[in-house]
């Protein structure tokens, strides 16, 4: 299967390449294993077991990136702007500092305590064709964060 990005004008070359990686390398057992790991990780984060998460789910060589993509109308694309920027770009040590900050009793943002619920969906997994130690995983995440009373924030990620 090929995706023609000229005909399907809304499909970026990156998205087409990512789709084909997972389409051509489907492995149900690998996908189930990735789903289980992501679900366990989400549960640890939901119950705010941050040190356990860091110890059991995060490797010392991690590069944790959260990227925000700018969605613009076609008429605005004539201007050359960065379409993506890092919200987070952290290594293991920076994540460890972030965890300790969250657990600090002086951290005013945790009073009253926040409640989280993560939904992990559309998990896909594929081994890298050039590096047998590299696993590509893609998923969608919906995060609900409940604060005081009825204040709820919802975040979406893919």
Swiss-Prot record:
It comes from the Bacteria. Pathway: Aromatic compound metabolism; naphthalene degradation. The gene is ndoC. InterPro entries: NTF2-like_dom_sf (IPR032710), Rng_hydr_dOase-bsu (IPR000391). Keywords: Aromatic hydrocarbons catabolism, Dioxygenase, Oxidoreductase, Plasmid. The lineage of its organism: Bacteria, Pseudomonadati, Pseudomonadota, Gammaproteobacteria, Pseudomonadales. GO terms for biological process: 3-phenylpropionate catabolic process. Gene3D superfamilies: 3.10.450.50. The naphthalene dioxygenase (NDO) multicomponent enzyme system is composed of an electron transfer component and a dioxygenase component (iron sulfur protein (ISP)). The electron transfer component is composed of a ferredoxin reductase (NdoR) and a ferredoxin (NdoA), and the dioxygenase component is formed of a heterohexamer (trimer of heterodimers) of three large alpha subunits (NdoB) and three small beta subunits (NdoC). This is Naphthalene 1,2-dioxygenase system, small oxygenase component. It comes from Pseudomonas fluorescens. Pfam families: Ring_hydroxyl_B (PF00866). Belongs to the bacterial ring-hydroxylating dioxygenase beta subunit family. Component of the naphthalene dioxygenase (NDO) multicomponent enzyme system which catalyzes the incorporation of both atoms of molecular oxygen into naphthalene to form cis-(1R,2S)-dihydroxy-1,2-dihydronaphthalene. The beta subunit seems to have a structural role in the holoenzyme. One of its GO terms (molecular function) is dioxygenase activity.
């Amino acid at each position: 299967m090929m995706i023609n990005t000229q005909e399907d004008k809304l499909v970026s070359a990156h998205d087409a390449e990512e789709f084909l990686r997972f389409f051509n390398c489907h492995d149900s057992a690998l996908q189930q294993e990735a789903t289980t790991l992501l679900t366990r990780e989400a549960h640890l984060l939901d119950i705010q077991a941050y040190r356990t998460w860091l110890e059991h789910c995060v490797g010392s060589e991690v590069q944790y990136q959260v990227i925000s993509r700018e969605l613009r109308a076609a008429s605005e694309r004539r201007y050359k702007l960065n379409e993506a920027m890092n919200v987070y770009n952290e290594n293991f040590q920076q994540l460890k500092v972030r965890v300790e900050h969250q657990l600090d009793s002086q951290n005013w943002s945790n009073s009253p305590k926040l409640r989280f619920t993560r939904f992990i969906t559309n998990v896909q997994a594929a081994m890298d064709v050039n590096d047998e130690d590299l696993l590509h995983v893609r998923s969608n995440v919906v995060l609900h964060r409940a604060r005081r009373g009825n204040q709820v924030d919802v975040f979406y990620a893919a």
